[in-house]
Amino acid sequence: MAVVKVIFSASGFGSATYEYADEESARAAMRCDAREVADEHGGKANEVGDEIVVARPGGEEIARWELEKS
């Protein structure tokens, strides 16, 4: 079974890697976390391909999630 990794990085917080059993679970977790961060920090989540970026209205990036399929 292939493992799907999500790489999370945030300015001032460093980075972390999370592993999921399938792509659907990984994407659901990314979207949930991105919404939460956007709500807490007044940003907006933008999903493009295998990546979600949360940024403030001026464009300053708050956090990023990248899907890595193995």
Regions of interest found by a model, annotated:
Residues M1-A16:
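Short aromatic-glycine-(Arg/Gly/Cys) micro-motifs in beta-strand/loop hairpins
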Residues G14-A38:
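Short, flexible N-terminal segments of the mature chain
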Residues R35-S70:
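Short, mixed-charge low-complexity intrinsically disordered segments
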